[in-house]
Regions:
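Membrane-lipid interaction segments
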Residues: 2-460
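Primarily a LysM-type cell-wall glycan-binding module
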Residues: 452-490, 495-510
Length: 510
C-alpha cells in the first residue's frame, strides 16, 4: 500500500552542461600601408571576448572575437603597434534539449604565438579556452511528512539557498576623454588596457541595483618625436536589473565583463587628435538566491509491516558570503638591463586559485607584469615577468563544502624605480565573488508498505533490554527493533534523544 505522503516543492539549479571548449586562433595578415615595417616584435597580446550567446534546443552558439595586438619597433627604434580582430563562432552540442536555460560563458586566452614572416607579414597561432555552463531552475518533489500513525519518520530541516533566478543586462558606455593641456596630441594608439569591476549590489523588490567602475588605460604615440604617453580614466556606472521574486532579504552574486571595447583617437575643434573616444559594451549578470528552511524526511520505517523506501540525493547550495573588495600587491622585480626611462607598466591576471583553510578563503594566482622601457642607449626594450599574489578573506565556516569562482580584475598598476636595474610594482586588484556552501542530503522521496509482510516478532517478548554503544542513536535503535521512538523515550524517562555511552535502554516491542 502506498502511503499518504505530504510532498513539497524544492527549487534547485540543474547543470545541463558544464565543460570547457577550445577555439583555435590561426591567421596570417599583412600590415596596412600606414604601419612601418617590423624590425623586432616585443609582444603579441590576445584578449578574447564573447559578444553574443544563443540557445537553440540542444545547441549553444557563442559568437565572439579575439583582439590581437602586435607590439613592435621599426628600423628607427620607434614603438609601433597593430591591432587585428579575429572573429569566431563556436557551437556546443548539449546532452538534451535545454530550451529556457541560462548560459554563462567565459573566454580566456590559453596561449598566443606570433612570427614575422617578412617585415610586413605576420603569422599568429593560439588557442582560446571557453568555460561554458548551461543551467536551468528545476523543481523537485520531496516528502515533508507521512500521514500514518504506524509510520515512524525522522524529520529534519535544512537551511538552503533557493535560486530565485538569473538575469543579464547589457550596458553601453560612450565617453570622450580629452587630453590634459600638458599632453601632446595623438598620432597613434599603441596599446589599451581595460577592466570592469562591480563595487556594490543592492536588492530591492524584484530588482537589483548594481554599481561598478570601468578602468581604461591608453598608451599612445604623440605627434613628433615625443616619448609615448599614457591616459588613464575611471568611468563609474549604475544599472537596475529586473529579477522576478527577489526581496531585500535575498543575496545576489553579480559580475561584470566587457563584451566590446572600441577606443579611437578623435579630432577636436583644434583640428588635432586631442581626445580619446571610448565605446564599450558591458554584460552584467546576476544570480539571486533567498535563504529558506526546508522541512524534509531523512528516514522512515513502519512499526508493523515491511516497507520499500525510495531515496534521492539532493545537493543544496547556500551563499555564505558575497565579496566586493580591492587589495594591493607590491612586488620588486629585478631587470636584465639598466633602464634610462620607463614608458609604461601593466599587469594581467594569468590564473587564479582558491582554497579554504582555518576560516579563511585564500585567493592566489599569478600576475604577468609587462614593462615598456628604454635602456641606457635609449633603445626600446620590452620585459615581462610573472609574479605571485595571495589574498586572505575571512568567511563563515559551515558544515557544507565551500566553493568559489572569484572574478579578479586589475584596477590599476604603477611602479617605483628603486635602482637602475630594479623596480617595485604596485598593483591594485578588484575581487568580486560569492562563496557558496554545497551540502548533499539523502532524502526519502517515496514509501510503499507491504501489508502482506508483517514484521516478525517474538510474541513472548514484550520488551528488550539494550545497551547503547558509542555510535548508536535513539533513531537507529528504534529502527532496529521497529519500535516507537516516543514510547522508548517515555519508558526510559528521557527528555531528549541524546544518549550516553553504555546507557541501558528498555525498548518496548508492542
Amino acid at each position: 500500500m502506498k502511503e499518504k505522503c505530504l510532498k513539497s516543492d524544492v527549487f534547485l539549479n540543474e547543470n545541463i552542461f558544464c565543460d570547457s571548449l577550445e577555439q583555435a586562433v590561426d591567421a596570417d595578415f599583412t600590415l596596412p600601408d600606414f604601419c612601418p615595417d617590423i624590425s623586432k616584435i616585443f609582444k603579441c597580446n590576445a584578449i578574447p571576448r564573447i559578444v553574443s550567446k544563443s540557445l537553440n534546443g540542444a545547441s549553444v552558439t557563442l559568437d565572439g572575437n579575439v583582439t590581437v595586438t602586435i607590439l613592435y619597433c621599426d628600423k628607427e627604434n620607434r614603438f609601433c603597434s597593430y591591432e587585428y580582430i579575429y572573429p569566431f563562432s563556436k557551437t556546443a552540442e548539449l546532452p538534451r534539449d535545454a530550451s529556457g536555460s541560462n548560459i554563462i560563458a567565459k573566454a580566456k586566452c590559453d596561449y598566443i604565438n606570433c612570427r614575422a614572416v617578412t617585415g610586413r607579414k605576420i603569422d599568429i597561432h593560439g588557442a582560446v579556452g571557453i568555460n561554458l555552463r548551461v543551467f536551468k531552475r528545476k523543481c523537485d518533489e520531496i516528502i515533508s511528512d507521512i500521514d500514518d500513525e504506524l509510520i515512524e519518520v525522522k524529520r529534519i530541516t535544512s537551511p538552503a539557498t533557493v535560486p530565485m533566478g538569473y538575469a543579464e543586462k547589457y550596458l553601453l558606455i560612450e565617453e570622450d576623454i580629452p587630453l590634459s593641456s600638458a599632453q601632446m596630441s595623438i598620432e597613434s594608439i599603441l596599446k589599451t588596457n581595460s577592466s570592469v569591476c562591480v563595487k556594490e549590489t543592492k536588492i530591492i523588490n524584484d530588482k537589483a541595483v548594481v554599481k561598478g567602475e570601468m578602468f581604461v588605460s591608453v598608451l599612445y604615440c604623440p605627434e613628433g618625436e615625443g616619448t609615448p604617453q599614457i591616459i588613464k580614466t575611471t568611468l563609474p556606472f549604475s544599472q537596475i536589473i529586473d529579477i522576478d521574486g527577489v526581496t531585500d532579504s535575498c543575496e545576489c552574486d553579480c559580475k561584470a565583463e566587457i563584451c566590446v571595447m572600441d577606443i579611437k583617437p578623435k579630432v577636436t575643434a583644434s583640428a588635432e587628435q586631442r581626445c580619446i573616444g571610448i565605446n564599450a559594451k558591458i554584460l552584467l549578470s546576476c544570480e539571486s538566491y533567498c535563504s529558506n528552511e526546508i522541512p524534509m524526511i531523512s528516514d522512515a520505517f513502519s512499526r508493523k509491516f515491511e516497507a520499500d523506501i525510495k531515496r534521492k540525493n539532493l545537493a543544496f547550495e547556500k551563499i555564505t558570503n558575497t565579496i566586493s573588495e580591492k587589495f594591493n600587491c607590491k612586488k620588486s622585480i629585478d631587470l636584465d638591463f639598466n633602464i634610462n626611462n620607463i614608458i609604461d607598466v601593466w599587469c594581467s591576471v594569468q590564473n587564479c586559485y582558491t582554497k579554504f583553510d582555518d576560516g579563511k578563503m585564500v585567493v592566489s594566482g599569478t600576475l604577468m607584469t609587462g614593462i615598456f622601457a628604454c635602456d641606457e642607449n635609449n633603445i626600446p626594450i620590452y620585459f615581462e615577468k610573472p609574479t605571485d599574489f595571495e589574498y586572505k578573506i575571512p568567511f563563515n565556516e559551515t558544515m557544507g563544502i565551500p566553493h568559489c569562482d572569484p572574478q579578479i580584475e586589475v584596477v590599476s598598476c604603477g611602479f617605483t624605480i628603486i635602482s637602475a636595474a630594479k623596480i617595485e610594482i604596485h598593483t591594485e586588484l578588484g575581487i568580486n565573488a560569492g562563496i557558496y556552501e554545497k551540502k548533499e542530503i539523502s532524502l526519502v522521496c517515496d514509501m510503499e508498505v507491504d501489508e502482506n509482510k508483517p514484521i516478525k516478532r517474538d510474541k513472548k517478548c514484550a520488551m528488550v533490554i539494550y545497551y547503547a554503544g558509542e555510535n548508536d542513536t535513539l533513531w537507529d535503535i528504534a529502527h532496529k527493533f521497529s519500535a516507537s521512538l516516543n514510547e522508548i523515550m517515555s519508558v526510559n524517562k528521557m527528555d531528549s534523544e541524546d544518549l550516553c555511552n553504555g546507557k541501558m535502554l528498555l525498548v518496548p516491542l508492542v
